[in-house]
Amino acid sequence: MRRLVTGGAGCIGSDLAAALAARGDEVVVLDNLSSGKIEHLAGLLDRPGFRLIEGDLSDTAMVDAAMEGVEMVYHLAANPDVKFTPGEPTDKDLTQNTLCTYNVLEAMRRRGISKLAFSSTSAVYGIAASLPIPEDAPFPRPISLYGATKLACEGLISSFQHLFGMQAWIFRFANVVGPKVRRKGRTVIGDFIHRLRQDPTRLMILGDGNQAKSYLLSEECVAAMLFAVERAQEPLNIFNLGCDDWLSVHAIADMVVEAMGLEGVRYEFTGGEGGWPGDVPRFLLDVGRINRLGWKARHNSREAVGLAIEASLAARPAEARTGTACRP
C-alpha cells in the first residue's frame, strides 16, 4: 500500500516514514525542508518504493500530484514552533497549519482518498480546569496561535470526514522528544544544552521552573499512531498520546547539568508561571483511551527525557561533556 507522509523529513515524520517502509509499505514523503532534514531520511532514499518530493503544501498542484496512487495520508507537516515570537506575522500558523491542512483534505477529496491520520497537539486544550484532561473534555480554549490553528485543523478534518465519507485519526501529542529533536530553542532540552555549551557556569530558565508536562519518545509516538490506526475503526478517532506522568522544567535542567558533568551551575529564572505568552504551565493528558485500546508508553517522562538528553549529547560528546562553547 502507498502512504503519503507530509512533513516526513521532520523528527516524527521521518520516524513514521521509516516504520511504514519497514513493514513493506510504499512511502511518499512531501516536505519543504524548511525544518525537516534530508539526513533524517538517509536510510530510505535508495529504498525501493520510497520517494521524496521537495515541495510545500501551499502548492495545491504539487499536493494533488503527490497523492497519485496513495491510499492513506499521514499529515504531520506544520509550523513546528509552538512559541509565538513578537514581530513575526500573526498568520504564520494559520497559513502553515490550517490552510495547508485544507489543501491536503481537498486534494484527498478530489482523489477519492478516504483515510487520514493527523498530528494535533495538547496545545488545543489551553489551560484545563482539571488534570489529567481527557479527549472529551469541555470545548477547548487554546491560548496560543499554534493551538488555535491546530484546533481549527481538527474542525476541518471532522467536517470533511462527515461530509465526504472519510475516516480520520486525530492524535493530540504530548511533548515529543527524541534523537532528532536537537535544535536549540525548539525544545527545552536543546535550549538548555545550547546555553550550557555557551556558558557552563549559569543557565537561564524561562518562567519559574515549575512548569510540568508529559514527554513521549518520537519512536513511541509513531508506534502509538500505527497501533491506533490498525485497531480503532470509528469514522472519527481522537486520541491523546503521551505518558501518565509529567516532569518539571527544573528537573530537566538538573538532568542536563548532570549529564554534561557540570557542577555549580547557577540557575537564573525569568519569572512567571509560563515560559512565554501562550505557554501552558502545567499539563497532563489523560491517556486512558489509548491504554484501553491496548497501547501504553514503555518509557515514562523522566526516562524519555533522559534518553533524549543522551542522544543530543552524543552528537557532540567532547563539547557537551566539558561545557565548551561551540556553534549550534
Which residue stretches match the model-derived regions?
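Short, solvent-exposed loop/turn segments at secondary-structure boundaries
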Residues: 86-89, 145, 180-184, 279-281
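Short, surface-exposed alpha-helical segments at coil->helix boundaries
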Residues: 38-41, 154, 190, 250, ...
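C-terminal substrate-binding subdomain of Rossmann-fold SDR/epimerase-dehydratase oxidoreductases
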Residues: 7, 16, 198-328
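NAD(P)-dependent short-chain dehydrogenase/reductase
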Residues: 130-132, 155-214, 218-227, 244-246, ...
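Residues in well-ordered alpha-helical elements
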Residues: 61-64, 71, 83, 91, ...
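N-terminal Rossmann-like NAD(P)+-binding domain of SDR-like oxidoreductases, especially those catalyzing
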Residues: 1-176, 326-327
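Hydrophobic aliphatic residues
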Residues: 45, 77, 108, 196-200, ...
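CheY-like receiver
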Residues: 65-69, 107, 195, 224, ...
